[in-house]
Regions:
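Short acidic-hydrophobic surface loop/beta-edge motif
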Residues: 41-48, 154-156
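Short, conserved active-site loop motifs that form the nucleotide-linked donor/cofactor pocket
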Residues: 35-37, 158
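Short His-Asn-centered micro-motif
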Residues: 1, 40-41, 55, 102-103, ...
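Conserved beta-sheet core of the metallophosphoesterase superfamily
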Residues: 1-23, 107-170
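Active-site donor-binding loop signature of nucleotide-sugar glycosyltransferases
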Residues: 41, 57, 69, 165, ...
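Active-site-proximal loop/helix segment associated with metal-binding centers of metalloenzymes
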Residues: 11-29, 34, 47-127
Length: 170
C-alpha cells in the first residue's frame, strides 16, 4: 500500500507502526494487521528479481468534507524530503527501475474523462502529478501502477487501478 490523502504516512510520527525490512526495502506494519504492509516512499523492493519503487501521495478534492487528523491529513502530498529521497533512490539506479507503484499518475496520464463535474480543476493542487511527470520523463521503466482516480484504465505502460487488482507482471 502506498500513502494517500486518507492516511497519514507512518513516518510522520504515528506510534502504532513498526518499521521493518521487506524484500530489500523498509516497510511499516501494525501489530494488529501484520499482513498489511505500508510501503515507504522512495524505498526500492525486490519482487522476484524485479525492482519496484513506492511513491505515495496526492491531493484530495473532497477534503472539505473530511475531518482533519481523522479522515484526511494535511501532509497528503510528498514533502520536499520525500521527493528528494525518491529522486536519490532513482538516481542511484541510473534512473532505471522495473516497476513504479504510485498513488496518483504523472500529469500527462490523468484520466480527465472521470473528473468530477463541478470541481474547479484550477483549484486542485497538481504539484505531485507535475513532479511525477518530471520523474516519468527521466525514468526508464517497464510498468507503472497507480490508483487515486477511482477508475480502471491502461495507457501505454501505465495502469490505473480501482476495483481491479492484478498480479504484477514480473
Amino acid at each position: 500500500m502506498s500513502d494517500a490523502g486518507y492516511e497519514t504516512p507512518p513516518e510522520e510520527g504515528l506510534d502504532v507502526y513498526d518499521e521493518r525490512e521487506w524484500h530489500g526495502g523498509q516497510v511499516f506494519t501494525e501489530d494488529r494487521y501484520p499482513n498489511i504492509l505500508f510501503a515507504k516512499d522512495g524505498e526500492i523492493y525486490d519482487l522476484d528479481g524485479q525492482k519496484a519503487i513506492a511513491i505515495g501521495g496526492a491531493y484530495s478534492i473532497d477534503k472539505a468534507w473530511c475531518v482533519k487528523g481523522r479522515s484526511w491529513w494535511p501532509d497528503e502530498q510528498p514533502s520536499t524530503e520525500i521527493k528528494s529521497r525518491v529522486e536519490q533512490a532513482l538516481g542511484k539506479r541510473g534512473w532505471n527501475i522495473d516497476i513504479v507503484l504510485s498513488h496518483t499518475t504523472p500529469l500527462k496520464y490523468e484520466p480527465t474523462e472521470v473528473f468530477i463535474r463541478g470541481v474547479d480543476q484550477s483549484k486542485v493542487d497538481k504539484s505531485t502529478e507535475i513532479w511525477l511527470d518530471s520523474i516519468e520523463d527521466r525514468l526508464t521503466y517497464r510498468k507503472w501502477y497507480c490508483g487515486h482516480y477511482h477508475t480502471e484504465k491502461k495507457i501505454d505502460r501505465l495502469q490505473i487501478m480501482f476495483n481491479d487488482y492484478a498480479a504484477l507482471e514480473l
